[in-house]
Design a protein with these regions (language model features):
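N-terminal Rossmann-like or analogous alpha/beta NTP/dinucleotide-binding catalytic cores
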Residues: 1-95, 172-190, 242-243
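Non-catalytic terminal extensions that flank enzyme cores
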Residues: 18-21, 119, 207-258
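Short secondary-structure transition/capping segments
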Residues: 62-78, 99-110, 237-255
């Protein structure tokens, strides 16, 4: 877990606890190519070291494939999906509009796409304000399933509904995904939670901290200082007496400010 991940975790934890809610932990481990052995155990250890104790059992998406398949089948029965082998390279960044390209890689695993419309999806983000997107024109028919794996968009929509998520707090890099998720929620007759997208932590090169950019993982040796920096980034600078306090004390102070 890098510093940007910690900021997102702290932001969502404080928001949930300020409202007297539960903070649920979901491990998004369905992308087998990107899953690193031992990473989940390390994340759980880091969260506990920083006083970020979750409520209930940890949810592993890799154990919920049947729930995602059922949602996909429901959309298929409504005639809202189609099979496609177009690659990202073939699309060259253009929205997919049910017109597959001629340069199809027939060796690639088939993807299932959702048919989109020209409907504009609008919502009010607690931090970013009003957001509107025409999914059909700006994104196109997006992937729900590829090969043996569900897409991120489908999985999180199913999980948010299944576990009664009332508020989603996450990084602003996922703001653009939210209209797609609301679109799926409406097609599946699922409730739409409230959303709050946090500012991103950027590296010295101006890029978002991420595993792909080789962001350094946080340690637990200087966790009091690291927690203070995370809270400061979120606008909750602890007072001087708490500057070197244990993370759980700093979190309790931040929660009480609400």
């Amino acid at each position: 877990m890098h510093f940007g991940s910690l900021v997102a975790a702290v932001g969502s934890f404080v928001s949930a606890k300020r409202q007297g809610g539960s903070w649920l932990l979901r491990i998004e481990d369905i992308d087998r190519v990107r899953v690193v052995r031992g990473a989940t155990a390390a994340i759980l250890t880091q969260l506990e070291a920083y006083g970020l104790f979750w409520d209930g059992a940890v949810v592993y998406q890799s154990e919920r494939l049947e729930a995602y398949r059922q949602a996909l089948e429901l959309l298929q029965k409504q005639g809202l999906t189609y099979s496609c082998r177009c690659s990202r390279k073939a699309l060259a960044g253009r929205p997919h509009t049910a017109q597959c390209t001629a340069a199809i890689d027939r060796t690639a695993p088939a993807a299932t796409r959702i048919r989109t419309t020209d409907e504009t999806i609008s919502f009010c983000d607690r931090l970013c304000g009003e957001v509107a997107q025409c999914v059909g024109r700006e994104v196109g028919d997006f992937v729900l399933w590829r090969g043996a794996e569900p897409s991120y968009q489908l999985a999180v929509v199913v999980d948010d509904a299944a576990f009664g998520i009332s508020e989603v707090v996450r990084g602003a890099d996922l703001l653009d995904s939210t209209p797609r998720q609301i679109y799926l929620q409406r097609l599946l007759a699922l409730a739409t939670p409230a959303y709050a997208h946090l500012p991103l932590v950027l590296g010295s090169d101006g890029a978002k901290l991420s595993k792909q950019n080789l962001a350094q993982p946080i340690g637990i040796e200087n966790r009091a200082e690291t927690m203070r920096k995370a809270l400061e980034f979120l606008g909750f600078a602890p007072p001087p007496p708490l500057a070197n306090a244990a993370p759980v004390e700093q979190l309790a102070w931040a929660i009480a400010q609400g």
